[in-house]
């Protein structure tokens, strides 16, 4: 008789990945450009209001007053006078246009723009974005967008039936905006500071040490866990770009806090390296979980060259009312705890509840992040 497939709980698959992540391994070094950014060198958000035309009857209805007013205003600038109340075009949609202005973008550079309907248009497919000024937070126009809108979904219907895929009321215009104004930033005139993407005292200290070892003492100073201040040597004052490029290529061993991420909805459990449990006992409904530490002694053979060493042996076990006991290896990790609950058929909700209780008791040496 063929073997019957064994059902796998929702979070069983995630345990393999979590266990692999928890295996101690030498920390990999990363380049500085993956760990930090130069303060002031960043993208800037742009936005604008525009019209998309050429829609096949899927635009805004006459109930969207601002679309009627926008169409009338546009025609008025072209010398055509019309009352907004008389606008009855369903092939026009009012949209909000957004873009990201890259650092050091020069006039003439093309950037992508995103468009999203503001009214009751059903789809922007096949539409054309008219000339739209894109301003920054200071109100100045930095780019102008225009072009055909690409939509990743569709909306079709007839006779009361409707078929929709993805979100056809938003889309993109590839290279649809031309930069008209550059953001003023004089690299080298302002103090040079590297901002860590994941603030950490150890990482900041290691980064400063790596820079000083490469370019000389006093070149870098860790100001706080998130910032490293740079002081170019006198010979590099006029070569700030080369100075920063050399620093970006340095490799630094980044450090981070131990963290456990769980999702109650999917049952996913991800634990990083260094996550451990302290001795604790937890009772949750019919489940009982115990993690304990026993003293042990490593005794060498008689007349051997070794010496007696004291050690500890960590054990964890989980039981269910009316069920058996699942013993774990001589370790006390989140992966072993999750695997024990998995063997007992516990639900993802049970796993999340147990981990939260262990954290509240101070027995989880890591941050616990619960995803929605």
UniProtKB/Swiss-Prot annotation:
Residues 1-29 form the signal peptide. The keyword Membrane does not apply. Coiled coil: none annotated. One of its GO terms (biological process) is bacterial-type flagellum-dependent cell motility. GO terms for cellular component: bacterial-type flagellum basal body, distal rod, P ring; outer membrane-bounded periplasmic space. The keyword Cytoplasm does not apply. Keywords: Bacterial flagellum, Periplasm, Signal. One of its GO terms (molecular function) is structural molecule activity. Its main location: periplasm. InterPro entries: Flag_FlgI. It is found in: Periplasm; Bacterial flagellum basal body. It holds the Pfam family FlgI. The basal body constitutes a major portion of the flagellar organelle and consists of four rings (L,P,S, and M) mounted on a central rod. Assembles around the rod to form the L-ring and probably protects the motor/basal body from shearing forces during rotation. Belongs to the FlgI family. HAMAP family: FlgI. This is Flagellar P-ring protein. It comes from Anaeromyxobacter dehalogenans (strain 2CP-1 / ATCC BAA-258). The lineage of its organism: Bacteria, Pseudomonadati, Myxococcota, Myxococcia, Myxococcales.
């Amino acid at each position: 008789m063929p073997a019957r497939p064994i059902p796998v709980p929702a979070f069983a698959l995630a345990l393999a990945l979590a266990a692999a992540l928890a295996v101690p391994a030498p920390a990999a070094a990363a380049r500085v450009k993956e760990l930090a950014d130069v303060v002031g060198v960043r993208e800037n958000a742009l936005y604008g209001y525009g019209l998309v035309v050429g829609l096949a009857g899927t635009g805004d209805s006459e109930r969207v007053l601002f679309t009627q007013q926008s169409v009338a205003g546009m025609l008025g600038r072209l010398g055509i006078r019309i009352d907004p109340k008389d606008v009855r075009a369903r092939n026009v949609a009012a949209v909000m246009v957004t873009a990201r202005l890259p650092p050091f973008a020069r006039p003439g550079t093309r950037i992508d723009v995103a468009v999203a309907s503001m009214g009751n248009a059903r789809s922007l497919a096949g539409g054309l974005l008219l000339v739209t000024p894109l301003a920054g937070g200071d109100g100045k126009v930095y780019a102008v967008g225009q072009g055909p809108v690409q939509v990743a979904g569709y909306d079709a219907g007839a006779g009361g039936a409707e078929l929709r895929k993805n979100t056809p009321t938003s889309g993109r215009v590839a290279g649809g905006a031309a930069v008209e104004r550059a953001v003023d930033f004089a690299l080298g005139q302002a103090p040079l500071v590297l901002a860590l993407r994941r603030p950490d005292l150890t990482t900041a200290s290691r980064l400063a040490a790596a820079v000083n070892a490469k370019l000389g003492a006093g070149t870098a100073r860790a100001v706080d866990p998130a910032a490293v201040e740079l002081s170019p040597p006198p010979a590099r004052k006029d070569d700030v770009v080369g100075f920063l490029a050399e620093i970006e290529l340095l490799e630094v061993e980044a450090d981070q806090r131990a963290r456990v991420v769980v999702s109650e909805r999917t049952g996913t459990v991800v634990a990083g390296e260094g996550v451990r449990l302290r001795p604790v006992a937890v009772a949750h409904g019919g489940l009982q979980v115990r993690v304990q530490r026993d003293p042990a002694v490593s005794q060498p053979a008689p007349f051997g060259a070794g010496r007696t060493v004291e050690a500890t042996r960590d054990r964890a076990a989980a039981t269910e009312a009316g069920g058996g006991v699942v013993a774990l290896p001589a370790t006390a990790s989140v992966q072993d705890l999750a695997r024990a609950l998995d063997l007992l058929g516990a639900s993802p909700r049970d796993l999340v509840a147990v981990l939260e209780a262990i954290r509240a008791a101070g027995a989880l040496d890591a941050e616990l992040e619960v995803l929605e």
